[in-house]
């Protein structure tokens, strides 16, 4: 084997240093990945745990920052010249590609943590050239320091770019604290080659080359590995606008955009700037993560002529859409319908379309004496030839004011979809209008219940006849919808009682209907008996009921504990609830309630870890919650799987004690997910369990945690830690409590 001059470029070479060598994942590729529960450790943050980004942002001279960004737009640098003397198009693409990785299925991706700075996003084929965009911004980031995060700066710069070219944006909110390491929780697909898609379609089984009839795996929202959305040349490079429309509708829909928002974003975004395909793609050097150290984090060094300016290659396409690419206009739509289009190729050999019988009047980006014919991408033509998109596009063409408003709103949604509720919005340009996709909840407009009221209500709830397990199950079902990824869900709003959550299979159970009915009666009785307008919301009452039941379970186990409770939640209405958007949040599996099963590609315990990460739980928090929820008898269907106790309903460490009992032998029954535990001597049946239960004995790291709670001195710690983890989940969405924002989660 030939030796490489640079070991960094030869993966078969193993560095003889700590952390190198064959890893556990190399030996056992299918081992459970717990690393996503250990992300964003405070020690990784150079700003320290005490740094309050929201306070820092609010101390920023915001409009001075915007002025500096606007000045940069036309300050062309020799090392990376601006197209048409204006960086607007480049910065719009940068912001779009930062925010556009968001997907509604799991809330991951998006611009919230500035992940475009890190692999793999910084090296995706779709992000060629954005390394230069971020470096252009460095002097501004350096000037304002920690008062502006990279996450906010990337998106704000896109907003300022639009404004600098004459477009009126809808507004902007800051508040995105930077992350300091790669987000390993995001699944970008199973392919091992850039631009591949042989795994993501139809479960990797069906003919993924049938571009007219294939299904993209959830939660993925891109047609190819390394692209933000779709191949602009058409599906798999086939210049078919109709087939491309199918891919567009799927991928933009996975990003929470409807057809009108999709048309507005494509037509609006392609009003500005150009694509780059001046020379062959094989003239581009390695991407940033593979580039030589001397490149200092830049990549794709271009050896074609000057490699920049008029000789730039990024996507390989060479298209300028409008006559005024640095000004807002309706020209994209005008040209789309004015001309017939014929297929051609860019200088780099990529499929694109040229206007038939058109004069050359489109400006060159660097030579004023040169003109070009109008050009379009295959995906642009989808807006004309897909019948649904065409209807919207023609309306926008005929009503430019509607187009501008739709683009402004869709762009705002694109940039803010993963920021969370309006309680997290900060800055002087936050729009006053409340939008449905922000999952609004009413403001508190009444006196809240006191500690004495809460105590009385807890007694009334426990005396209502509803099983404590049902109270706990309802509280968990409400609060555990929270996703730390996009900060959606949670107990605030009590949407557990509304469509679609109440119809979800995991929730459509007798215990939920009974509990809600009783709690609504208690609420009505309490509220009508109060003077001075004091009220308790169903949202608060659901959580309070869970608190009461957990406290009772601890008392019954011999431990007097007080589970924290802070009122202030309000009740959302059905009209405030976007049914489609919340439907995308329905869990495929929820191992905390022993709901769901393994598939041919995902084991049940992997769904459990995925859910725990979305709940921002650590591995100890995951373990203690599972152990507690099992002995509290809260399986969604009332089954006894994993209920390793002879005293269900008491908050004991029995789950761990009995799981670790060597007198029990386990065997698989009923498929891959169900197990039976029998006495090793007598063979008598003792327990049944699922993979969600037994993983705490089979996985070495989880077993180590289970042993702490299953030891003779583990009971008191178990109760204490369960209460802390329970309280954390109940309050994950309580941004109104003004908890200090942090990219790290609480650790046991």
UniProtKB/Swiss-Prot annotation:
Heme b binds at residue 270. GO terms for biological process: cellular response to hydrogen peroxide; hydrogen peroxide catabolic process. It comes from the Eukaryota. Binds 1 heme b (iron(II)-protoporphyrin IX) group per monomer. Disruption phenotype: Reduces the fungal tolerance to hydrogen peroxide but not to heat stress. GO terms for cellular component: cytosol. Pfam families: peroxidase. The keyword rRNA-binding does not apply. It catalyses: H2O2 + AH2 = A + 2 H2O; 2 H2O2 = O2 + 2 H2O. It is found in: Cytoplasm. There is a cross-link at residues 229-255 (Tryptophyl-tyrosyl-methioninium (Tyr-Met) (with W-96)). There is a cross-link at residues 96-229 (Tryptophyl-tyrosyl-methioninium (Trp-Tyr) (with M-255)). Its EC number is 1.11.1.21. Homodimer or homotetramer. Bifunctional enzyme with both catalase and broad-spectrum peroxidase activity. Plays a crucial role in oxidative stress response during infection. Acts as an antigen and elicits antibody response in P.marneffei-infected AIDS patients, healthy people working in mycological laboratory, and healthy people in an endemic area. Belongs to the peroxidase family. Peroxidase/catalase subfamily. This is Catalase-peroxidase.
């Amino acid at each position: 084997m030939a030796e490489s001059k640079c070991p960094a470029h030869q993966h078969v070479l193993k560095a003889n240093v700590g952390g190198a060598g064959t890893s556990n994942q190399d030996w056992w590729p299918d081992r459970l990945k717990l690393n996503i529960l250990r992300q964003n450790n405070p020690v990784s943050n150079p700003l320290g745990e005490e740094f309050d980004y929201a306070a820092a942002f609010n101390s920023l001279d915001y409009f001075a920052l915007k002025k500096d960004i606007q000045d940069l737009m036309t300050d062309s640098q020799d090392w990376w010249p601006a197209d048409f003397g204006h960086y607007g198009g480049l910065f719009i693409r940068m912001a779009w590609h930062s925010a556009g990785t968001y997907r509604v299925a799991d809330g991951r991706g998006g611009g919230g943590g500035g992940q475009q700075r890190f692999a793999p996003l910084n090296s995706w084929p779709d992000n060629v050239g954005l390394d230069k965009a971020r470096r252009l911004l460095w002097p501004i980031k350096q000037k304002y320091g920690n008062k502006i995060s990279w996450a906010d700066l990337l998106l704000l710069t896109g907003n300022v770019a639009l404004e600098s070219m004459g477009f009126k944006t809808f507004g902007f909110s800051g508040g995105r604290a930077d992350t300091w390491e790669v987000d390993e929780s995001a699944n970008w697909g199973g392919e091992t080659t850039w631009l591949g898609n042989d795994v993501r379609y139809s479960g990797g089984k069906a003919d993924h080359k049938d571009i007219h009839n294939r299904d993209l795996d959830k939660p993925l929202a891109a047609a190819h590995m390394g692209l933000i959305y779709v191949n602009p040349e058409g599906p798999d490079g086939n210049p078919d606008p109709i087939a491309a429309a199918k891919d567009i509708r799927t991928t933009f829909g996975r990003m929470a955009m409807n057809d009108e928002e999709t048309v507005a974003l494509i037509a609006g975004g392609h009003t500005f700037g150009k694509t780059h395909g001046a020379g062959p793609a094989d003239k581009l050097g390695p991407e940033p993560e593979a580039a030589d150290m001397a490149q200092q984090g830049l990549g794709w060094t271009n050896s074609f002529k000057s490699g920049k300016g008029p000789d730039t290659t990024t996507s390989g396409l060479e298209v300028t859409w409008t006559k005024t690419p640095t000004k807002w206009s309706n020209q994209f739509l005008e040209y789309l319908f004015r001309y017939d289009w014929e297929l051609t190729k860019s200088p780099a050999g990529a499929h694109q379309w040229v206007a038939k019988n058109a004069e050359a009047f489109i400006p060159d980006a660097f030579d004023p004496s040169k003109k070009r014919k109008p050009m379009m991408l295959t995906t642009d033509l989808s807006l004309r030839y897909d019948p649904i998109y065409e209807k919207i596009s023609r309306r926008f063409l005929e009503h430019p004011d509607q187009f501008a408003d739709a683009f402004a709103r869709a762009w705002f949604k694109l940039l803010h979809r993963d920021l969370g509720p309006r309680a997290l919005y900060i800055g002087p340009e936050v729009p006053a209008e409340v939008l449905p996709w922000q999952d609004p909840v009413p403001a508190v407009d009444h006196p809240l219940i006191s500690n004495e009221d809460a105590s009385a209500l807890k007694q009334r709830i426990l005396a209502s006849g509803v099983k404590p397990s049902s109270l706990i199950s309802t509280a968990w079902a409400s609060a555990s919808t929270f996703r730390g990824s996009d900060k959606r869900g949670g107990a605030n709003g009590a949407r557990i009682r509304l469509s679609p959550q109440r119809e979800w299979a995991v929730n459509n159970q007798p215990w939920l209907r009974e509990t809600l009915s009783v709690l609504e009666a208690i609420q009505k009785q309490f509220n009508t008996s109060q003077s001075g307008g004091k009220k308790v919301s169903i949202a608060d009452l659901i959580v309070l009921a869970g608190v009461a039941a957990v406290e009772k379970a601890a008392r019954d186990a011999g431990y007097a504990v007080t589970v924290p409770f802070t009122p202030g939640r309000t009740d959302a209405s059905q009209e405030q609830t976007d049914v489609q958007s919340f439907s995308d949040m329905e869990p495929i599996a929820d191992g905390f309630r022993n709901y769901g099963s393994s598939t041919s590609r995902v084991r049940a315990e992997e769904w459990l870890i995925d859910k725990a990460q979305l709940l921002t739980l650590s591995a100890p928090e995951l373990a203690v919650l599972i152990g507690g929820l099992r002995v509290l008898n809260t399986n969604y269907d009332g089954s006894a799987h994993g209920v390793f106790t002879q005293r269900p309903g008491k908050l004991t460490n029995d789950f761990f004690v009995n799981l670790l009992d060597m007198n029990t032998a386990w065997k698989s029954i009923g498929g891959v997910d169900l197990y039976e535990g029998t006495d090793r001597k007598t063979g008598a049946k003792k327990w049944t369990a699922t993979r969600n239960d037994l993983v705490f004995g089979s996985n070495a790291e989880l077993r180590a945690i289970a042993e702490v709670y299953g030891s003779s001195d583990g009971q008191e710690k178990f109760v204490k830690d369960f209460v802390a983890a329970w309280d954390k989940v109940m309050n994950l969405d309580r941004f109104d409590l003004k908890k200090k924002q942090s990219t790290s989660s609480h650790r046991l």
